[in-house]
């Protein structure tokens, strides 16, 4: 019997520590952490060296020292044009119809596991360095973190470089308008691939127009960010109050010093 389920694909925040479970968030079941599947967990800086060190050497040949690139990782990290890496999250169904620990949830795990096996082969210009299937939250889902790059670049800069637009273009995705970017096209394509895999397990993609269901993890992270902002604002207010108090104390001390000087002058 065929079951209908939604398929979600969205850009994640890229919290590598969260994905590795270096800390346990509120929405994570500690008793299920051992069920998570780690497909890849590589050091981001080391992967940057692997991908770009030779290109950096070629670029630096004949360049003045002040124009040479000494650390491409830091150049991208401090720059504004590209991100160090991107994350995409995929999920089938939701907590009501594909909850972890249920028969349907286990089926979702099998589908996601099958889907991710050919991800790197299918997307050679998106170098995956971190990939996890989480089964310790409300619904099974995949976190795939990758570095988009292009080789044999003929434009300005290094011949091998970070570029989401060019990496996706080389995979055949040409952006249209702001609602039809290369990234949106690619995510929709990957959802279709996931849907084909799901079909083999008796799951039909239930499409709900352009409105996609948000992942539980996304809602949690959004809540956490709001909480962090509120805490920072409170800390700012506290520091501002401290600063004002210190300023008043300094002014008072200066006045006392001036009074002492005046008294000393009078006694003379």
Kindly give the residue locations of the regions a language model identified.
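N-terminal nicking endonuclease/strand-transfer module with a His-rich metal-binding environment
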Residues: 1-268
